UniProtKB/Swiss-Prot annotation:
Pfam families assigned: TruB-C_2, TruB_C_2, TruB_N
Protein name: tRNA pseudouridine synthase B
GO molecular function, one term: RNA binding
The EC number(s) this enzyme carries: 5.4.99.25
Function in brief: Responsible for synthesis of pseudouridine from uracil-55 in the psi GC loop of transfer RNAs.
Active-site residues per Swiss-Prot or TrEMBL entry: D48
PANTHER family found in the cross-reference section: PSEUDOURIDYLATE SYNTHASE TRUB1 (PTHR13767:SF2), TRNA-PSEUDOURIDINE SYNTHASE (PTHR13767)
Organism: Sodalis glossinidius (strain morsitans)
């Protein structure tokens, strides 16, 4: 006789995972989902197996707002090998060229300055970007090259931490859709020596503090020590789901207007932002219940609402 299945939970919140080296983002997601016994879970932008660092995992109703974290700014620490270019632009690929490195700090800083600010970037063939429903890396592994359009990106800050004639270490604060491996590959070509990513760590997503990250091993230890039938210690690590949209202006509504929004109706509001997405709360308790949009001054329309108000 088989073991009885353990029912999942309707648990809402966001856990900031410190992704370990060598594990795919989806593998980590499934492990976390099982640990929390969550009915629904989703991550907010994959990290390569080579990469480590912050991977927000949304549970339950928080998955409705994961796109806003996918669209958020990111901060990375990267170590690049100079003098060697690979077909994947990272250490997991095949070496395609080896060249001598002739470099001084003035020339390096001048090359780095090229990447600061607004620019356009052609995504790597070894990225998870989809083409006809399939990630580009699937085509690349079959030797197929797909034409990709350059996309606008913004590097808000790029700091040189240390360098020598074999490697360079950078910290990069950038917009969504920025491929660090492409920056490193382009940097290597600009320097004339080639380069690839040796190590990559995501330090931040949006404004989430690095101090709130937790490792998979820590979650597993907490779950192993937890009393039977309670996950309170794990749940205490969850951030509220509205933290995903904390940068949006807040609109607090009385219960009657909140009820109308839940029915899909547009409501009139005063003394609110003129336009754009807003974070919605209800009543004196300020319970979060989703996001809306002010498409015209004084008119609020529902966009993504949770199933019911959560405390």
């Amino acid at each position: 006789m088989g073991r009885p299945s353990r029912r999942g939970r309707d648990i809402d919140g966001i856990v900031l995972l410190d992704k370990p080296l060598g594990l795919s983002s989806n593998d980590l997601l499934q492990k976390v989902k099982r640990l929390f016994r969550a009915n629904k879970a989703g991550h907010t932008g994959a990290l390569d197996p080579l990469a480590t660092g912050m991977l927000p995992v949304c549970l339950g109703e928080a998955t409705k707002f994961s796109q806003h974290l996918l669209d958020a700014d990111k901060r990375y620490r990267v170590i690049a090998r100079l003098g060697e270019r690979t077909d994947t632009s990272d250490a997991e690929g095949q070496t395609v060229s080896v060249r001598p490195v002739s470099l001084d700090k003035t020339r390096l800083e001048a090359a780095l300055d090229h990447f600061r600010g607004e620019s356009s970037q052609v995504p790597s063939m070894f990225s998870a970007l989809k083409h006809q429903g399939r990630p580009l890396y699937e085509y690349a592994r079959k030797g197929i090259t797909v034409e990709r359009e350059a996309r606008p990106i913004h590097v808000y800050d790029l700091q040189l931490h240390r360098w020598d004639l074999t490697k360079v270490e950078l910290e990069i604060h950038c917009s969504k859709g920025t491929y660090i491996r492409t920056i490193i590959d382009d940097l290597g070509e600009r320097l004339g020596c080639g380069a690839h990513v040796m190590a990559l760590r995501r330090l931040a997503v949006a404004r989430y503090p690095i101090e709130r990250m937790v490792t998979l091993a820590a979650l597993q230890a907490i779950a192993a020590d937890a009393p039977p039938d309670t996950l309170a210690q794990l749940d205490a690590l969850l951030l509220p789901m509205d933290s995903a949209v904390a940068d949006m202006p807040l609109v607090n509504l009385p219960s009657d207007l909140a009820a109308r929004l839940r029915l899909g109706q547009t409501v009139a509001v005063t003394a609110q932002p003129q336009a754009g997405l807003v974070r919605l709360t209800e009543g004196d308790a300020g319970r979060f219940f989703g996001i809306g949009e002010i498409a015209a001054p004084g008119r609020l329309t529902p966009r993504r609402l949770i199933a019911e108000p959560r405390a």
